[in-house]
């Protein structure tokens, strides 16, 4: 128990001195390196959980004093409440703060600063001592070079130079050297001043070659002025394939056939050591050649080529530079190479003479189809413009200092050209007529390549029964020329050949030469028979009108055209092939109205009350456009159409009429035409009744006075009449023979009317017996009259004078009398006459 007491006390004191470590956390590098005169930068962080830092002391090699319960040692830095720093503490700077940063800087640092630095930290309730190791050397310590595990030639590697020192107040630089010479590659330098590490590092990337093997690489530490401070060196171990060199006897490697050649392979470097040896010619390994010496005895031209030796190690095979062995020999049989073959006519061609020879040929002899080409001694022959005769076989002979070669088989030059001398040949017998079948062939003289097709122009729906033959069915008149082309890769056209097709005249037509305007009656007219073409050109003309031959000249002339010359004209043109008719051409003659006449419908005699139509008929071209009507007095009537319609027609309308027609050419008039209008039966009856009534009244008075005196005469007269008559009643209308028509000239008496002539009208008055009824019409009276043997009849006649007033458009000079004269015809019946009544019936006739 007595032994444990002091130790327990020591532990308690230690605990009190260091407080609770779980409440303080520090981060900083464990060891820092520097050298005399340099500086030290101590990056440091801390965390005090119970409050801010109140006191900080930096000790050098601190030791805890148990007696005083404090740390003893050299105080390099101590913070004071008034902020004053002792003079000896100026090289040490506390760069931290009161809660987390405890960074320090010592500048300059001395050798005796090596050891342990103690950071005494105190807060209000806690205390802590943190220790940091400082290693200060007398001289600058060297950097350390780091190499990759293996270095191979031509593979990029990174060399690293590391120095465990860095301080803001003391700049340094790291320099790379190869065999004491600064390296050209740029290095990348970096520094670290963190709580984890403090260093300066330089990295260099380069691709080592086999020649770098065994070379010394140096990393040199320099101050800011480039002054050497220290360095580190390493020897490069570059793995590489064997590096070889060939030696040849003879040294120029030029021999003639039959000579001997020796080649020796020497290894200048290999890392690691080589294992196998081989020889190659033109990239191909030579069999059974596994030594460093290659002996070639009695070489031939085939042994010419590129030789090299190959030695292998664990890295790979290494090859020497190639040695070109030239075995000289005379030219071999030559061959000809033709550039641009087959050649097109007109293009350029180049010939190349190829002959294996060593040395190269210096002179050439050229042959065309076995004949030497004079002046051609070069390796190449150039023809700027090739022609068909250049085609053929070309060969050559080469010559060098060792001899002359032999002529090879040669090369064939194919000169291609379009078909030559192409012609179109007509196979038909001449001449060719329109509608014939024509056969043509396309011929040519030569062609290379052969003709494969033919073309024809103009194009048409024609038949090609065989290649180069054209058959034209039903040849047209206008097939003037035909041309053909023979084609291979190109087409050559022949000159057009004229078919000279003979045909009948074409496009025959009638053309009016004069007059240039409309044709009027009386004009001089010329018609021309035209046609567009005819082959042969000798032609004849024929004129036709309505199928009647007129003439045989090319022109048809009318000195004075008349309407009768109008009609449909056509002309014919013929040659030895045939004839062609023109289309019918209508000759139209314009003339004034002529041959006018007035036609009447239904006739020239019309009963009053009916209708009469007078038509003015004419012959005119152009047709009549205007009509004018005139009466017998040349008075113009207010009618201007072709037809004059009278409805109802009156007796006053009787007379002579004429018409006049007008067109754009002129006028024409018709002769007089007479219209006769006669009375209707009703009018005649009325007028006869009136006339007879008047006559009867006068006659009765006369009869009464002369009754007895003339009784016997009437009896005798009546008996005479009975002997010659059937005793029937009758009415006589004397028709007067029509007068000769008046002259064509107009007259003042109007139109002749036969009804207006002097005439005698008869009527019979019948006196019936007593108590027998009487009718007023003639027909009933006739049917009811007694037999002739018992009928007493008196026949009266009325003579009418012609009156001037009966003519239209004529006014009488003085009043006229009735112009009626009466007479009596007495018919005595057979037997005794019955007692008659005393009354008398009258018939009066009036116009």
Swiss-Prot record:
Boundaries of every Ig-like V-type domain copy: 20-138
Superkingdom classification of source: Eukaryota
Motif segment (ITIM motif 2): 794-799
PTM notes: Phosphorylation of Tyr-762, Tyr-807 and Tyr-822 are involved in binding to SYK, GRB2 and SYK, respectively. Phosphorylation of Tyr-842 is involved in binding to SYK, PLCG2 and PIK3R1/PIK3R2. Phosphorylated on tyrosine residues by LYN.
Transmembrane intervals: 688-706
Main location: membrane
Phosphotyrosine PTM positions: 762, 807, 822, 842
CDD domains: IgC1_CD22_d2, IgC2_CD22_d3, IgV_CD22_d1
Localization (cell): Cell membrane
Disulphide bonds in the chain: 39-167, 44-102, 161-219, 265-309, 353-396, 442-484, 529-571, 616-659
Binding site for N-acetylneuraminate: 120
InterPro entries in the cross-refs: CD80_C2-set, Ig-like_dom, Ig-like_dom_sf, Ig-like_fold, Ig_CD22, Ig_sub, Ig_sub2
Tissue expression from the record: B-lymphocytes.
Known glycosylation sites: 67, 101, 112, 135, 164, 231, 363, 445, 479, 574, 634
Motif (ITIM motif 1): 760-765
Domain notes: Contains 4 copies of a cytoplasmic motif that is referred to as the immunoreceptor tyrosine-based inhibitor motif (ITIM). This motif is involved in modulation of cellular responses. The phosphorylated ITIM motif can bind the SH2 domain of several SH2-containing phosphatases.
Family classification: Belongs to the immunoglobulin superfamily. SIGLEC (sialic acid binding Ig-like lectin) family.
Protein name: B-cell receptor CD22
Species this protein is from: Homo sapiens (Human)
Source taxonomy: Eukaryota, Metazoa, Chordata, Craniata, Vertebrata
């Amino acid at each position: 128990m007595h032994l444990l007491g002091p130790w327990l006390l020591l532990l308690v004191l230690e605990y009190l001195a260091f407080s609770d470590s779980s409440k303080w956390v520090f981060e900083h590098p464990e060891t820092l390196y520097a050298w005399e005169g340099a500086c030290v930068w101590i990056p440091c962080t801390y965390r005090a959980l119970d409050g801010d830092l109140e006191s900080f002391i930096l000790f050098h090699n601190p030791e805890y004093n148990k007696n005083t319960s404090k740390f003893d040692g050299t105080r390099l830095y101590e913070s004071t409440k008034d902020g004053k720093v002792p003079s000896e503490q100026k090289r040490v700077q506390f760069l931290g703060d009161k809660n987390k940063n405890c960074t320090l800087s010592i500048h300059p640092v001395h050798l005796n600063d090596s050891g342990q630095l103690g950071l005494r930290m105190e807060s209000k309730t806690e205390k802590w001592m943190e220790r940091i190791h400082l290693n200060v050397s007398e001289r600058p310590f060297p950097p350390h070079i780091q190499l990759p595990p293996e270095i191979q030639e031509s593979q990029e590697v990174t060399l690293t130079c590391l120095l465990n020192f860095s301080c803001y107040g003391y700049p340094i630089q790291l320099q790379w050297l190869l065999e004491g010479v600064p390296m050209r590659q740029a290095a990348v330098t970096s520094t670290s001043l963190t709580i984890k590490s403090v260093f300066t590092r330089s990295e260099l990337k380069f691709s080592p070659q086999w020649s770098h093997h065994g070379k010394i690489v140096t990393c040199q530490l320099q101050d800011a002025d480039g002054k050497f401070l220290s360095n580190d060196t390493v020897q490069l171990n570059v793995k590489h394939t064997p590096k070889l060199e060939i030696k040849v006897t003879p040294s120029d490697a030029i021999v003639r056939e039959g000579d001997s050649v020796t080649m020796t392979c020497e290894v200048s470097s290999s890392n690691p050591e080589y294992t196998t040896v081989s020889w190659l010619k033109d990239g191909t390994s030579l069999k059974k050649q596994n030594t460093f010496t290659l002996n070639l005895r009695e070489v031939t031209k085939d042994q010419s080529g590129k030789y090299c030796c190959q030695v292998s190690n664990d890295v790979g095979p290494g090859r020497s530079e190639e040695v070109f062995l030239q075995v000289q020999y005379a030219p071999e049989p030559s061959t000809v190479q033709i550039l641009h073959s087959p050649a097109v006519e007109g293009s350029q061609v180049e010939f190349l003479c190829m002959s294996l020879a060593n040395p190269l040929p210096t002179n050439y002899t050229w042959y065309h189809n076995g004949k030497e080409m004079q002046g051609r001694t070069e390796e190449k022959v150039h023809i700027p413009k090739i022609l068909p005769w250049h085609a053929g076989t070309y060969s050559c002979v080469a010559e060098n200092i060792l001899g002359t070669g032999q002529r090879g088989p040669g090369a064939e030059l194919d000169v291609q050209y379009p078909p030559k001398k192409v012609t179109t040949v007509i196979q038909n017998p001449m001449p060719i007529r329109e509608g014939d079948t024509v056969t043509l062939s396309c011929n040519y003289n030569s062609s290379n390549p052969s003709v494969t097709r033919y073309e024809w122009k103009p194009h048409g729906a024609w038949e090609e029964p065989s290649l180069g033959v054209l058959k034209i069915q039903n040849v047209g008149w206008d097939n003037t020329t035909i041309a053909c082309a023979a084609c291979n890769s190109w087409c050559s056209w022949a000159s057009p050949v004229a078919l000279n097709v003979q045909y009948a005249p074409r496009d025959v037509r009638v053309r009016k030469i004069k007059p240039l305007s409309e044709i009027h009656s009386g004009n001089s007219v010329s018609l021309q028979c035209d046609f567009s073409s005819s082959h042969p050109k000798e032609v004849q003309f024929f004129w036709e009108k309505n199928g009647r031959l007129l003439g045989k000249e090319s022109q048809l002339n009318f000195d004075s055209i008349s309407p009768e010359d109008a009609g449909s004209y056509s002309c014919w043109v013929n040659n030895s092939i045939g004839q062609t008719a023109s289309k019918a051409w209508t000759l139209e003659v314009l003339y004034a109205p002529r041959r006018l006449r007035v036609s009447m419908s239904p006739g020239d005699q019309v009963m009053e009350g009916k209708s009469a139509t007078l038509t003015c008929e004419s012959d005119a071209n152009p047709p009549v456009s205007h009509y004018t009507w005139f009466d017998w007095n040349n008075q113009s009537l207010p009618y201007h159409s072709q037809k004059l319609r009278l409805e109802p027609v009156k007796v006053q309308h009787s007379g002579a009429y004429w018409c006049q027609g007008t067109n754009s050419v002129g006028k024409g008039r018709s002769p007089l035409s007479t219209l006769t209008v006669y009375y209707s039966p009703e009018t005649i009856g009325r007028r006869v009744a009136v006339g007879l009534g008047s006559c009867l009244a006068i006659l009765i008075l006369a009869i009464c006075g002369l009754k007895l005196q003339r009784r016997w005469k009437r009896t005798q007269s009546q008996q005479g009449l009975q002997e010659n008559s059937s005793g029937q009643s009758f009415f006589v209308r004397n028709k007067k023979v029509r007068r000769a028509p008046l002259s064509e000239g107009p007259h003042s008496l109007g139109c002749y009317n036969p009804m207006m002539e002097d005439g005698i009208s008869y009527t019979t008055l019948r006196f019936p017996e007593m108590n027998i009824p009487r009718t007023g019409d003639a027909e009933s009276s006739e049917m009811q009259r007694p037999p002739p043997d018992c009928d007493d009849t008196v026949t009266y006649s009325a003579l009418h004078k012609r009156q001037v007033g009966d003519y239209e458009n004529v006014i009488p000079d003085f009043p006229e009398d009735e112009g009626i004269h009466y007479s009596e015809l007495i018919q005595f019946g057979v037997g005794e006459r019955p007692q008659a009544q005393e009354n008398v019936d009258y018939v009066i006739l009036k116009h």
